[in-house]
């Protein structure tokens, strides 16, 4: 199972990826985690990424694509993977398609969790209140203003992926506002048709 989960921040991608990972025994591949691992391993590509990050710049698509390609080759990805936070742009999606084809692989599905942005802000505010009530640490970007900025960035940079994958026939859209169990069941129906 090779899968991409799309949706704005707070849509539940991480929750669904965790459930699918547990059920199917496939890894969730996060670009942030992959970049940190490459830097820690001091691989050639990791050293290049570190130099860019140390300069306070965004890591180029070329470097990110190479790190993703190397990670997909790892033994734990033999039965599939869930991509989290990649691709973020249409050029990255095109590079991923070319990369997978070169490995004799293809995506099984691109699943977009459709959500109402105003409801997402309320969901985030509830999560913050719950975390504070439990005495937990709140993420610095978990405030309405920062969250809305992340939503705008998603809309501008990442949402064009929906049109791209709709054009390839790989996109499946799910109501991300449904309860977690219903979203999971719908994803399973897409991945394992009756």
From Swiss-Prot:
Binding site for AMP: 31, 36, 57-59, 85-88, 92, 139, 150
Keywords, in A-Z order: ATP-binding, Cytoplasm, Kinase, Nucleotide biosynthesis, Nucleotide-binding, Transferase
Pathway stated in the Swiss-Prot or TrEMBL entry: Purine metabolism; AMP biosynthesis via salvage pathway; AMP from ADP: step 1/1
Domain notes: Consists of three domains, a large central CORE domain and two small peripheral domains, NMPbind and LID, which undergo movements during catalysis. The LID domain closes over the site of phosphoryl transfer upon ATP binding. Assembling and dissambling the active center during each catalytic cycle provides an effective means to prevent ATP hydrolysis.
InterPro entries referenced in this protein's UniProt entry, alphabetically: Adenyl_kin_sub, Adenylat/UMP-CMP_kin, Adenylat_kinase_CS, P-loop_NTPase
One GO BP annotation of this record: AMP salvage
Entry annotated with the keyword Cell inner membrane: no
Catalytic activity annotation: AMP + ATP = 2 ADP
UniProt protein name: Adenylate kinase
LID as annotated region, ranges: 126-142
Native source species: Brucella anthropi (strain ATCC 49188 / DSM 6882 / CCUG 24695 / JCM 21032 / LMG 3331 / NBRC 15819 / NCTC 12168 / Alc 37) (Ochrobactrum anthropi)
